[in-house]
Amino acid sequence: MLTCQRKRESLSKGIAGKNATRSLAILGLFAAPWVGFLAVALKPSPRQMWSQRWPTITFVGLYQLALDRCVEIFGLEHLPRTGPVILAGNHINKTACDAMLMGSKILVERGSLAKFVSQPNPPDRMLKHFLRLMGNADGVILPIQKGLTTETMIKFLRNPEAFGRQQPILGIFPAGSADGDFEAQMNRPWHTGVAVAACESGAPVVPFYIEGLPYHWGPFDLLKAASRSLVGSRAFDFKIHLGPPIVPGPGQTNYAEVTERIRHGVLQLAG
């Protein structure tokens, strides 16, 4: 009983501390809006964030002020603190807002800026513009290039310094496109690129299962959700579940088998 009470008290103090920090940050914005916002955005990892383009800086700042309270992560202990890591799991949002939220949460919790593999030609004109801005070497997006994507993934995992990183964390959606139907996404063929990158680089694959974000939401929906979160309760409840790392054996070349192990890991997390 006493242990449970202490845990509850510790959790309450942690939440109170986060809320106090958030309130101070908001007050700072009133005093010096642009300087205050930039300070908030750069805080998780000043060196990495300073090299980012304005859409990334803006989103990370907004995330810390209003959206972090809408995102929960479970199993963070499974994410290695050093060395290359691949995150692989389900994809639930057609404009990759799930990747943006997941990357921001890991940045806030660990100080590492993840890079997510992305489709090269999104249908929306604004998203295409963002992709061009954030798809550079230091950016948070690794655009798919026919015949070159897996090679670039391996380079990122082996030589993070060339991409402005200390620890390379690569996010991949092996099913490809997003789908609101989890079962359908699990049953369709998965790309083996994640397995190839893991086997070639020696990086462990941490499976993830995400839930709680509408399929159709775009950046403007997140902006509206942020405004609601600033003045009231959480606008949505996005949950990230991380599983134990999957490590390919030495000399492993059966990429289909490794891919199935990853798929099974995601299914286990989904329950």
Each predicted region: which residue ranges?
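N-terminal membrane-anchoring alpha-helices
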Residues: 3-64
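Intrinsic low-complexity, intrinsically disordered segments enriched in polar/basic residues
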Residues: 6-8, 223, 271
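Feature targets compositionally biased, intrinsically disordered low-complexity regions
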Residues: 13-16, 27, 35, 82, ...
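Polar low-complexity intrinsically disordered regions enriched in Ser/Thr and small residues
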Residues: 17-20, 39, 78, 150, ...
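Generic structural signal for hydrophobic residues
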Residues: 58-59, 127, 194, 262
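Soluble catalytic domains of membrane acyltransferases
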Residues: 64-256
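Short, cationic low-complexity segments
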Residues: 260-271
